[in-house]
Amino acid sequence: MKRAWQRMLSGRRLDLLDPTPMDIEIEDIAHGLAFVARWNGQTTGDYAYSVAEHSLLVEELFARANPGIGERWRLAALLHDAPEYVLGDMITPVKAAIGKGYVELDDRLTAAVHLRFGLPAVLPAPIKRAIKAADTVSARLEAEQIAGFSEAEADRIFGKPDPVLVRGLAIRLRPPPEVRAAFTARHHVLLRSLSG
């Protein structure tokens, strides 16, 4: 069999087919996500809109949509796309075309990431749905603000967002090192709140 692992900047060797929580480091995740572009890089601005930046927005939207939700589930929202630090961010039509193989890889990596940071390997269905709802609102904002969709087209594909939910939010484009630091800092805040 060919090599199925990747050497991470932390020095860890992550087996992509059989990942273990011991091989997951937040610095590797933050670095990878800060350099992975959403929308295949087809966005306006001087910097690609990164998966790390998107994840920060999803966590904020999730918290706004679910007042009083615990930090544990906010951490899950922040990490909702964590496997993309090694798999990359494929747009939805490509994921659908690839099918089951991609889903299985994503599920294995997700479980390892969750276990590494004290979350259940598989999230409860209501939490998963609530995170997906925040993810969809984020995609809607991104589509219109930076990905070239008209308002009507974005509404048709992603739905019209609740104006109260998105009030004051704007898509941020930052250099990868800056968003990497922001993602890592947010992760540390959420993780610290879980440990008391």
From Swiss-Prot:
Tell me which domain of life the UniProt entry assigns to the organism this sequence originates from: Bacteria
- Listed transmembrane segments: none
- SMART domains for the chain: HDc (SM00471)
**Protein's UniProt name:** Uncharacterized protein RCAP_rcc00048
- InterPro entries tied to this protein: HD/PDEase_dom, HD_domain
Domain HD stretches: 51-164
**Organism listed in the record:** Rhodobacter capsulatus (strain ATCC BAA-309 / NBRC 16581 / SB1003)
Q: Which Pfam family, just one, is annotated for this protein?
A: HD
